[in-house]
Amino acid sequence: MKKGNMIYEGKAKKIFATDNPDLVIQEFKDDASAFNALKKGTILGKGVVNNEVSCHLFSHLAGLGIENHFVEKLSEREMLCKKLEIIKAEVVMRNIAAGSLVKRYGLQEAQVLPFPIAELYLKDDALGDPLMNDAHAVAMGIASAEEIQFVKQEASKVNAALQVFFLERGLKLVDFKLEFGRHNGKILLGDEISPDTCRLWDAETMKKLDKDRFRFDLGDVEEAYIEVRHRVLGN
């Protein structure tokens, strides 16, 4: 597989073309950002951890029948993926109150929600990725009502599967962000699943093992990412 020109660079990843128009290479960076890029920094080795964790979790989900863009791991920082037309609606699944949910509604942090909540956010850095509802997404032409319904159903399946997966490894899946895209007439799960996109707490101590350690200057950021990698991969 020949690596071509870079076709996109985001805050945490670069996307490269390949000699196959249906496939791209996703490369993970050590760059870190928070609060809509108002805070920036570097987490040493983050790209390696996020690539390895994402590869493992995408493979696990595929084995459960949840289709996604992952094809194969190419290197410690790179994965080969199906090229998606990204849907500009991010899905956040929430199981435990944390982050913006606490701030927005005055909930107690760590309050277990009676059922998982699915939220939609407009994928737009300039606007700060605002919260939106299904009607907004359809009215703005982001996706059809049927596509939004499918994306939410898939997100719920991913949530159920990952809650079990992480709990078996001593981690609570507090909340996480998912992105989806279109590929050859199908909607597939894309992007990444990692400590960058998931809030993960130790099931016993409730220690935060994710990007919140960077966001709020909690220290031991690299160690937290390595711990998640160790638990996910088992080595």
Curated annotation (Swiss-Prot):
Keyword check for Ligase: yes
GO biological process: 'de novo' IMP biosynthetic process; cobalamin biosynthetic process
Keyword annotations: ATP-binding, Ligase, Nucleotide-binding, Purine biosynthesis
Gene3D superfamilies: ATP-grasp fold, B domain (3.30.470.20), Phosphorylase Kinase, domain 1 (3.30.200.20)
Ligase among keywords: yes
Name of one Pfam family that matches: SAICAR_synt
Catalytic activity: 5-amino-1-(5-phospho-D-ribosyl)imidazole-4-carboxylate + L-aspartate + ATP = (2S)-2-[5-amino-1-(5-phospho-beta-D-ribosyl)imidazole-4-carboxamido]succinate + ADP + phosphate + 2 H(+)
EC id: 6.3.2.6
Segments passing through the bilayer: none
Recorded metabolic or biological pathway in which this protein acts: Purine metabolism; IMP biosynthesis via de novo pathway; 5-amino-1-(5-phospho-D-ribosyl)imidazole-4-carboxamide from 5-amino-1-(5-phospho-D-ribosyl)imidazole-4-carboxylate: step 1/2
SUPFAM superfamilies: SAICAR synthase-like (SSF56104)
One GO MF term attached to the UniProt entry: phosphoribosylaminoimidazolesuccinocarboxamide synthase activity
Listed PROSITE patterns: SAICAR_SYNTHETASE_2 (PS01058)
Superkingdom of the source species: Bacteria
Family per similarity comment: Belongs to the SAICAR synthetase family.
Protein name, entry field: Phosphoribosylaminoimidazole-succinocarboxamide synthase
Organism of this sequence: Chloroherpeton thalassium (strain ATCC 35110 / GB-78)
